[in-house]
Amino acid sequence: MAKAKFERTKPHVNIGTIGHVDHGKTTLTAAITTVLAKQGKAEARAYDQIDAAPEERERGITISTAHVEYETDNRHYAHVDCPGHADYVKNMITGAAQMDGAILVVSAADGPMPQTREHILLSRQVGVPYIVVFLNKCDMVDDEELLELVEMEVRDLLSEYDFPGDEVPVIKGSALKALEGDPAWEAKIIELMNAVDEYIPTPQREVDKPFMMPVEDVFSITGRGTVATGRVERGILKVGDQVEIIGLSEEPKATTVTGVEMFRKLLDQAEAGDNIGALLRGVSRDEVQRGQVLAKPGTITPHTKFKAQVYVLTKEEGGRHTPFFSNYRPQFYFRTTDVTGIIQLPEGVEMVMPGDNIEMTVELIAPIAIEEGTKFSIREGGRTVGAGSVSEIIE
């Protein structure tokens, strides 16, 4: 029998469960698939199937992540769940699982805990735009006032990190009871999914964003000009479009694309995901290089100084064996190239240990096309020692 074709009829949204260890993230993930499976909108996945998450590598870092998919009436969802706290930190910072929104799971019996706060902070820093709250284990709390108190605490915590704490939907339920098939608690899972459907907007598709392509290679074709090759990261490029060559030099250079080819065939246009060669008018071989980007004029600018949220690899992950201090000068790998940068640690932080997750300020020795949310690796002598996400542009 032919394999079922993935019908792209519904808009696609990436979400994930976040929250403190043992508050029920994986149980909730199992409950969502189980309840939706009864409506024929998912394949039921048991707790053990999700918990035994396979390891993946992203930017040289090993991360365990479970992926499940399911549908509601309106959408198709890809949902990520991580077994360990460190996996969440790594996942969010490397962008291995880009989230359009997250379900924050908080145990009603315990209230917000340290990792609850840390995951909210991470969501803010790496640009997870929307959070919906699932207050779990409500079957274990008899006192209605206590539930309201926990809800208020969670809302305050979200507001503290610039999420709209007053507007965020909070669903009170029990993932375990829903998983066991109790109809009253199953209804709460449906209520949660309705809230996710309504509150988390459909993300703008990559192809609808302004054009940008990191340059991987450059060569000249005699009699035709200079070709820059790479994979289109977002947007659409048409023959005749004006683009800017950005990064590694003070001023962007403007040019016109006179040809687009893919697999040696000429195209009228290329879109996000395509590997292409772009023929650039009036650009000599030495005016464009790997590490720069081609972009729609005025949409992205080169910067040298920014704040970033960074995860530092442990020795076991192949990272450093020793801590580092302010003025540490590793290489920052953006998209296709390494640039040296100088690190300044936050006030009161003397050093960073392998395994830490920290915000730092970075100053690059050459400008690179970056924006909030741009991901990078930190490398030293060719090996990855950290991963980061730009949280704020300084200059």
Curated annotation (Swiss-Prot):
Compartments reported by the entry: Cytoplasm
Region (G3): 81-84
Binding site for GTP: 19-26, 81-85, 136-139
Residues binding Mg(2+), per UniProt: 26
GO cellular component: cytosol
InterPro entries listed in its UniProt record: EF-Tu_GTP-bd, EF-Tu_GTPase, EFTu-like_2, EFTU_2, G_TR_CS, P-loop_NTPase, Small_GTP-bd, T_Tr_GTP-bd_dom
Gene3D superfamilies membership: P-loop containing nucleotide triphosphate hydrolases (3.40.50.300), Translation factors (2.40.30.10)
Top enzyme class: hydrolase
Region G4, residue ranges: 136-139
Record region (G1): 19-26
Domain called tr-type G: residue spans: 10-204
Annotated spans, G5: 174-176
Alphabetic keyword roster: Cytoplasm, Elongation factor, GTP-binding, Hydrolase, Magnesium, Metal-binding, Nucleotide-binding, Protein biosynthesis
Known partners and oligomeric status: Monomer.
Protein function: GTP hydrolase that promotes the GTP-dependent binding of aminoacyl-tRNA to the A-site of ribosomes during protein biosynthesis.
Family from the record: Belongs to the TRAFAC class translation factor GTPase superfamily. Classic translation factor GTPase family. EF-Tu/EF-1A subfamily.
Identification of the protein by name: Elongation factor Tu
